[in-house]
Design a protein with these regions (language model features):
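Bacterial N-terminal signal peptides that target proteins for export
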Residues: 2-15
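Metal-centered catalytic cores of metalloenzymes
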Residues: 2-4, 24-81, 85-147
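Cleavable N-terminal signal peptides
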Residues: 15-16, 26
């Protein structure tokens, strides 16, 4: 009888210890992205010889997207640049986050909404740089995870 009483007293403690041991806590993560910008990725494509690159990291705890980018060979000064989404490759979408590309290289950061983060993480964001000759975008690249 005493053994059974001790077992009843210890069982909740053992169960709690097991829950604590085997629980998987959610850890913050920093995820890297890269986009190679080129005219052939624009929709529709154009004949510009310009190229560029954007690298970015997304911190899941702070919801902050931080990026660095560069471009060269544009037909004229960059007038605008943006992250766009949600869109699969070959499709266009609205502006998700503006970029200030007054000169190359450029860098900045922004906090994302949960919906924006979900689209980014699902590979449905792209970057493009606009010029006077190509107001819809001269170069573009899809953000790819893990680059």
């Amino acid at each position: 009888m005493i053994g059974l009483t001790l077992l009843r007293l210890r069982l909740p403690g053992v169960a709690l210890a097991a829950c604590v041991m085997f629980a998987s806590p959610a850890f913050a993560e920093t995820i890297s992205f890269k986009a190679d910008l080129k005219a052939s990725e624009e929709v529709p494509p154009n004949d510009s010889k310009a190229t560029g690159t954007v690298t970015a990291t997304y911190d899941t705890a702070s919801k902050k997207l931080t990026w660095k980018g560069n471009y060269s060979g544009l037909t004229g000064p960059a007038t605008m640049a943006h992250f766009h989404g949600p869109a699969e490759p070959g499709k266009n979408a609205g502006v998700a986050v503006p970029i200030t590309p007054s000169a190359s290289p450029f860098e900045n950061s922004a906090n994302l909404t949960d919906a924006q983060a979900a689209d980014l993480l699902a590979g449905r964001w792209y970057v493009n740089v606009h010029t006077g000759a190509h107001p819809g975008g001269e170069i573009r690249g899809q953000l790819v995870k893990g680059m």
